[in-house]
């Protein structure tokens, strides 16, 4: 899984000694925070006020502290058992956003338990395993904490204690196909991967996914091949004629925008050499500069246009 380590803080004090036997599950308690400002604050805060190893939110995982080092994260004796401590932001505005981050949260907690050689169990009587902050508050020696996270926040999005336990122990089934959140759509393959910064043909239709994996829609894209492509509101790549912002464009079967002369169904059209828009009701000079072509109001080439030269030299078309 992708983990951003741009705010990984080194030099934090070691708490306890190895082996560390717990992974701790937290939520931030801040309804306005983002994953980035949580990471930024952790970067500069006094570690004696507490520190943790990871924060999940806004479809990202950021590692902000070391693992296998202990941590001041649960306010008691089990600080010295912390292999990793994971915070989940509490500022989600839609269920789709929450579920995307919840999936990352579960996957990360399980992966960290595997990494530490710990059982993927939640809040059991055994010392080793994944423990919520609430469980630590109620069961650790020398407790000085009153925190009950992450249960209240999970419950606010419909995740019960039983569901959380099941998801920790069994994992979440991989979501496949089209997925949506507040930013846009992406497509998940059967192996859990998704396309980034590339074209992909899905069910016979071509789409383009940006560097973050989101589908382009209602947008132009200049590709590395030098060609321009257009993706409509549904994300489908344009081919053939397409009216965009009241201008007509033509795209070949590969989706590339055409310029210059184009023959379509035995009729010639001219597409602006720079912008690609169809030219209409206008004269276009021949390539050798010896003459002019006339394009009718519908954009088709007039094979035998009739002109009138007005007294002031203005040329009009009959």
Swiss-Prot record:
One of its GO terms (molecular function) is N-acetylmuramoyl-L-alanine amidase activity. Its main location: secreted. InterPro entries: Amidase/PGRP_sf, Amidase_domain, Cell_wall/Cho-bd_repeat. SMART domains: Ami_2. It catalyses: Hydrolyzes the link between N-acetylmuramoyl residues and L-amino acid residues in certain cell-wall glycopeptides. Keywords: Antimicrobial, Bacteriolytic enzyme, Cell wall biogenesis/degradation, Hydrolase, Repeat, Secreted. Belongs to the N-acetylmuramoyl-L-alanine amidase 2 family. This is Lytic amidase. It comes from Streptococcus pneumoniae phage HB-3.
